[in-house]
């Protein structure tokens, strides 16, 4: 019971020594059905009269009386067979009714299971759809943020490039202006050595007096005075 689909059942039953159904293979019968089947097993024929039985017992059996039970047995045997068939058909009807009830119950349970499964599937589908929509919105938002950030950095890079170009242009202009001013201030000058005589005398003195260099100290002082005088003269003329 409760399966997703209904299948055809093959049902068999067994009879006891009184030809009553006791075992129904494949389906468990309820107590109500078993009670109904027990009621069908009850003998509907009324019991024989006790007086008549007593009269038969006091009578001396004769040849005709001896043959009576056989005749009576022959007449009642078809009735018993017919009664057995009727009882069997009643039991079969009860079984079929029970099977139909079980089948209806199984179909209803299967329908409920399928309905619940469909509802769960729909709910899950809705949840997945909502989750997909939410993820899509988050992705769109993130993509918009990345685009805005990319545009911001691109603008910053463009501004930095413009500033660097402007600085380079200004530096180049300043350099060229300074170079032009420097070229205008520079004049051709003839440089002549100063104090050449004293320089030659000092060199000769040091060669001659390598072990007594103090003898050249007066020439060295005179050479330094000559150099200082030349510096002062240069500053005065080009100051």
From Swiss-Prot:
The keyword Mitochondrion applies. Residues 79-88 have a biased composition (Basic and acidic residues). InterPro entries: MIC19/MIC25, MIC25. Residues 27-88, 113-133 are annotated as: Disordered. A motif (Cx9C motif 1) lies at residues 195-205. Keywords: Coiled coil, Disulfide bond, Lipoprotein, Membrane, Mitochondrion, Mitochondrion inner membrane, Myristate. It is found in: Mitochondrion inner membrane. Disulfide bonds join 195-226, 205-216. Residues 50-78 have a biased composition (Polar residues). Residues 79-166 form a coiled coil. GO terms for biological process: cristae formation; DNA damage response; inner mitochondrial membrane organization. Component of the mitochondrial contact site and cristae organizing system (MICOS) complex (also known as MINOS or MitOS complex). Belongs to the MICOS complex subunit Mic19 family. Metazoan Mic25 subfamily. Component of the MICOS complex, a large protein complex of the mitochondrial inner membrane that plays crucial roles in the maintenance of crista junctions, inner membrane architecture, and formation of contact sites to the outer membrane. This is MICOS complex subunit mic25a. It comes from Danio rerio. The lineage of its organism: Eukaryota, Metazoa, Chordata, Craniata, Vertebrata.
């Amino acid at each position: 019971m409760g399966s997703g689909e209904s299948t055809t059942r093959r049902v068999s039953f067994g009879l006891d020594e009184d030809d009553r159904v006791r075992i129904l293979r494949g389906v468990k019968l309820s107590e109500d059905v078993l009670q109904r089947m027990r009621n069908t097993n009850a003998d509907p024929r009324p019991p024989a009269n006790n007086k008549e039985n007593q009269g038969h017992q006091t009578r001396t059996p004769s040849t005709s009386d001896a043959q009576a039970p056989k005749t009576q047995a022959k007449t009642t045997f078809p009735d018993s067979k017919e009664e057995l068939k009727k009882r069997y058909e009643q039991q079969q009807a009860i079984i079929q009714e029970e099977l139909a009830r079980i089948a209806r119950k199984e179909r209803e349970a299967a329908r409920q299971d399928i309905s619940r499964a469909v509802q769960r599937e729909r709910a899950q589908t809705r949840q997945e759809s909502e989750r997909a929509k939410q993820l899509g919105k988050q992705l769109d938002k993130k993509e918009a943020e990345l685009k805005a950030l990319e545009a911001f950095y691109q603008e910053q890079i463009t501004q930095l490039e413009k500033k660097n170009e402007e600085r380079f242009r200004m530096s180049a202009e300043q350099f060229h202006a300074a170079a032009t001013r420097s070229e205008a201030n520079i004049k051709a000058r003839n440089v002549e050595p100063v104090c050449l005589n004293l320089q030659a005398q000092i060199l000769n003195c040091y060669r001659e007096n390598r072990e007594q260099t103090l003898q050249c100290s007066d020439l060295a002082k005179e050479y330094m005075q000559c150099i200082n005088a030349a510096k002062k003269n240069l500053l005065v003329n080009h100051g």
